[in-house]
A protein has these predicted regions:
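An N-terminal domain-start capping segment
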Residues: 2-17, 66-95, 162-182
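Conserved small/polar residues in nucleotide/adenosyl-binding loops
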Residues: 232-234
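Charged, low-complexity surface segments at secondary-structure and domain boundaries
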Residues: 4-5, 15-19, 60-64, 121-128, ...
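Phosphate-binding glycine-rich loops and adjacent basic patches that engage nucleotide phosphates
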Residues: 14-16, 32-43, 98-100, 200-212
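Phosphate-binding site of ATP-dependent enzymes
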Residues: 106, 132-228
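Membrane-proximal basic amphipathic "stem/tether" segments
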Residues: 1-61
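A conserved helix-loop-beta module that forms one wall/lid of the active-site cleft
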Residues: 46-129, 139-157
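Charged, low-complexity, helix/coiled-coil-prone segments
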Residues: 9-25, 47, 79, 181-199
Length: 234
């Protein structure tokens, strides 16, 4: 089936089209957004598929109660309250703008990201090697990110109204010595029960996604990223 991605090859153009359409009512926008991604129209009256149910929730669920979970800074307090400290990467600072960052106070290795979005991670492995051009590139990237309303793109209410920051965390190495970065585990819950998970590897280089059931049986599921060609040590 045709999708917006298959018809419009340029990602910037696709994003521009969706930005132009943001003024339309949420149910219509969500239906167009779903079609653009899947090539099918969602059944928002009687949702059956997982993705349809997520779209239904955007319209009918009080998503504002999840806002602090979507905020990568505030969720740290929630996690600490529920299971104790020691489970989060140490945070080194947060700033309302890139120009507020005191790079002299940061270690040689650290990670930058925004708290209100997805995909804004920058891994700094050698601070001393950063050139003026590198700093300017980071400045443009994060100033642009801090202006983005992440709610508007997919109409996910949990992102609406988050106070935006760029923040730094301690760089963490994989105990196995994998230079591609630490493994990233994500779980997919259906009706409140975890059924599927994926492990992301090589985050710092060429990310791979591998899906498993809850008994760690490898599943033949692909996302936008390829599967790993080597055995994953869980």
């Amino acid at each position: 089936m045709a999708t917006l991605k298959s018809v419009v090859k340029s990602r910037d153009t696709r994003n521009f089209i969706m930005r132009v359409l943001r003024f339309i009512p949420t149910p219509i926008y969500i239906s167009l957004y779903y079609w653009a991604a899947t090539g099918k129209w969602p059944d928002l009256k009687h949702p059956t598929y997982f993705n349809e149910k997520l779209q239904w929730m955007k319209i009918h669920e009080d998503y504002t109660k999840y806002r602090d979970y979507a905020d990568k800074i505030k969720v740290r307090d929630i996690i600490e309250e529920k299971i104790g400290d020691g489970y989060m990467f140490p945070m080194l600072g947060k700033w309302k703008s890139f120009d507020e960052i005191d790079f002299d106070s940061l270690p040689e290795e650290f990670v930058l990201k925004c708290n209100h979005d997805s995909g804004s991670v920058k891994v700094i492995r050698n601070k001393s090697a950063l050139t003026d051009k590198d700093i300017e590139s980071l400045r443009k990237f994060y100033n642009s990110r801090l202006k983005q309303d992440f709610y508007g793109h997919g109409r996910e209410p949990c992102y609406k109204g988050i106070d935006r920051y760029v923040f730094a965390e301690k760089f963490m190495k994989d105990p196995s010595g994998d230079e591609g970065g630490i493994k990233d585990y994500k779980f997919f819950c259906f009706n409140g029960k975890p059924e599927i998970m994926f492990i992301a590897t090589d985050r710092a280089t060429d990310v791979k996604f591998d899906f498993f059931d809850m008994d760690f049986n490898h599943l033949d599921i692909t996302n936008i990223h390829p599967q790993s060609l080597s055995l994953i040590h869980i």
